[in-house]
Amino acid sequence: MRFFVSCAKGLEYLLVDEVLALGAAGATATVAGVNVEGGLCDAQRLVLWSRLASRVLWPLAAFACADEDALYAGVAALPWVEHVLPGQTLAVDAHVSGEAITHARYAAQRVKDAVVDTLRDAGVVRPSVDVEHPDVRLNLSLRKGRATLSVDLGGRALHHRGWRQAPHAASLKEHLAAAVLLRAGWAKVYAEGGGLLDPMCGSGTLLIEGALMVADVAPGLSRYADPDAMSHVSVAERPVLLPSRWRGFDVVAWEALVVDAQQRARRGLAELRPVLHGSDIDPRALGAAFANARAAGVQDAIEFVVAGIDVLPAVSEPHGVVVCNAPYDVRLAADPGLYRHLGDALRRVVPRWRAALVCGSSTLAFATGLRADKKYQFFNGALECVLIVCDPVVPLAREAGGAQALSEGAQMAANRLRKNVQRLKKWRIRAGVECYRVYDADLPEYAAAIDVYQEVDGARRLFLHVQEYAAPASIPEGDVRRRRHELLAAVRAVFDVSVAQVALKTRQRGKGGSQYGCFAQRGEFFHVCEHGALLRVNLFDYLDTGLFLDHRPLRGRMAREAVGKRFLNVFCYTGVASVEAAVAGAAATTSVDLSSTYLHWCTDNFALNGQGGVRHRLVQADALAWLEAERGQYDVIFCDPPTFSNSARADDFDVQRDHVRLLRAAVARLTPGGVLYFSNNFRRFRLDVDAVAAFAQCEEISPVTIDLDFSRNTRIHRTWLLWR
């Protein structure tokens, strides 16, 4: 059986590891969650034991849903007497996207109506609504015209642990605290005799989660503890209630899981060493922290001290982990000076320890002055955060000399990069953009385009793609090298990346624009995400990366239009537009390119997303010749030819010379009502409007195909919409 476990964005691959460690047969990451292969007992084990999950959703039905009537009918078709007992309470959570139903609360209401009406018609006492503590919580996901209805086996958001007695401003949610500790390798450090220090502990979330983690206490023991049980009783001894009273819930299996978890908790709490230290300048925050630690049963393992970061608590452990959720949001204003003082204090007091610091941005992370070995991005609610891991705080090779200061020119470039990062941040979060252009020759003396690529799996590293424009012959070679080194130094400083994470290329302009070629031959591919599709990119081995970032909005538009339709992509390159159309729900795709290298790459992209087979055809052919011979019909066609190409296997192609012939052949393949998107990046291109008007209607739509990150270079491509 396949079920879904949701999580905060950025934790997907950590959750895959946890799910597999807890006994699931299989797990595949997707955006903000994991698809899990396993039985009901596996799902209930995750409810009890997962430290990272937000919800565990057990599917009841999936059905086509074109409108509210289809939603009602699909829900009403289920045998609800087998799921809900007479008189139970009910809640429905809904998440909707697309055009079928646009209001989540209305969708939830229709689901509730269908359940209630079905039970009433069966002569069963109707359930009442309890949105806070229902007996049965249902979850509706409505996306791309398809509804999935599930039971929320946990009954509530799993980041709630049950021990939080006193909330505190800007507290890190418990499942995010667990992710920080896992990224920091805290359990291994504890097993080796190390300690844990949080110099800005607030209400104690990181320390309490750290103690419960190494004490082997299941999060569900306190979450579902009987509230009528005496509070002073150990979490390992309190009665544990059912998380859900859904009729399908396996009560016997749950009780066995709880007994085993309680035995492990007794043993772990008895052996827990007092090696956790927390400090905060706010006495009220520490009062909340101690109350929370007492409720969790770990107050004897944590030492709390009122102190600012200038006076870190003394630690006796020779090695350990520093964790910290430094202020960064509107409730606790971010202060780069505070981050700088934090970095100074850690270098002074615990230089040999490992540090895992949650920062609000790369700029704030840079302010610590610490060199990150690893860098991760995740979301704390709607806030995008950066986690840096420094191991150790002060690398041995740098203790004597310290960090190298940026030159005046490099500092100027760094300031511009930081300004651009900040300018794009709200747009990126709102649009879900993870790969973007951050700089495009903003400063004339640093003439380069810089793109950011966010890895979505593994360590979630950042990679930078720096394309240096060839300098005029009048610029001395020494100045060219100096400016190049200054720009690269600025890139590494602002984004806190190693040399190995920066790809540098110099573009040479010729008749056909930049030509493809091989470079480093590192064979280093990694995965990124765009519009919900996983994509394979390589920043080092070719001039281009496998993903043309400037076409991002056009790909999104075509994917939305291709739902349920036939999509054709000629000159398909690595097939990104085809893959995104397939993921969005295209009925079929055809991708044509002459290059076997790119078609193999395209195949890999389809496989990454679980797509392929006869519905998604790949054709190795000269695109123009293939179009003129093809007899199939397509609803949406994408044609993005190169400016110029030559090959031993095909005639030379020149977009200015051949575009009318190309467009005539492509338009002939359109179904009635079909559309063709034609785009190219030849700056001097002139569409032969009169010739095209003989066989198609045409409208230039270039402005709406340029996103904010390419607003400095609005002529990076031009795009026309054609139809018959």
From Swiss-Prot:
What protein family does this chain belong to?
A: Belongs to the methyltransferase superfamily. RlmKL family.
What is the annotated localization of this protein?
A: Cytoplasm
Q: Which HAMAP family match?
A: 23SrRNA_methyltr_KL (MF_01858)
Q: Which Pfam families match?
A: Methyltrans_SAM, RlmL_1st, THUMP, UPF0020
Query: What's in the keyword line of the UniProt record?
Result: Cytoplasm, Methyltransferase, RNA-binding, rRNA processing, S-adenosyl-L-methionine, Transferase
Name the job this protein performs. Specifically methylates the guanine in position 2445 (m2G2445) and the guanine in position 2069 (m7G2069) of 23S rRNA.
- Cited NCBIfam families: PRK11783.1
Q: What is the organism field in this record?
A: Xylella fastidiosa (strain Temecula1 / ATCC 700964)
Can you name this protein?
Ribosomal RNA large subunit methyltransferase K/L
